[in-house]
């Protein structure tokens, strides 16, 4: 209950973004010539010891934004010639992201990428259906022992093993 305090994701009741900008160094297939319109959300439900965005994932860095402001950020990134809107580690903000996407969609003409750690619940994925064009999960662990030791998440693979087929069901196999 985030009304009573921060959750496992290190976040409270507001959307917090660490950075929103063109990002030319994402996976080459989504960066293109101008870069991916990347929104790095603060916080994360995983506790990976090797996280490359540790400051973003463990601390409430960045700025709080409203749903309307988030939708405006998506459109501004599109105006800057982003090849897509790349939502990085947004699972814990999904209800608000969905609202922002619904606000922006009439004017948004570039694909939406859900860039996640693969640890997505069916409820989250069902909320995103029809709004996300590309799922970009990182499949991190196979064994409960490894996931528990390195992410404090022993059920990681059992959750991801259900999430990834659902992602494929929604958007189909990748086309390069």
Where are the model-predicted features located?
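Conserved C-terminal portion of the radical SAM core fold
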Residues: 159-176
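Conserved Radical SAM active-site core
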Residues: 5-135, 143-144
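A general structural signal for well-ordered alpha-helical packing
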Residues: 125, 129, 157-164
């Amino acid at each position: 209950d985030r009304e009573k305090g921060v959750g496992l994701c290190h976040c409270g009741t507001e959307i917090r973004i660490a950075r929103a900008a063109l990002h030319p160094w994402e996976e080459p297939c989504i960066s293109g010539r101008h870069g991916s319109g990347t929104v790095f959300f603060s916080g994360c439900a995983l506790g990976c010891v090797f996280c490359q965005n540790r400051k973003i994932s463990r601390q409430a860095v960045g700025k709080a934004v409203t749903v309307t402001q988030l939708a405006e950020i998506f459109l501004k990134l599109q105006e800057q010639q982003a090849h897509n809107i790349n939502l990085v580690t947004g699972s814990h903000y999904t209800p608000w992201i969905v609202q922002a996407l619904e606000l922006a969609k009439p004017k948004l003409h570039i694909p939406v990428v859900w860039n996640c750690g693969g640890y997505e619940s069916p409820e989250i994925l069902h909320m995103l259906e029809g709004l996300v064009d590309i799922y970009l999960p990182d499949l991190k662990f196979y064994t409960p022992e490894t996931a528990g030791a390195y992410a404090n998440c022993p059920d990681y693979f059992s959750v991801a093993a259900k999430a990834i087929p659902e992602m494929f069901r929604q958007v189909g196999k990748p086309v390069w």
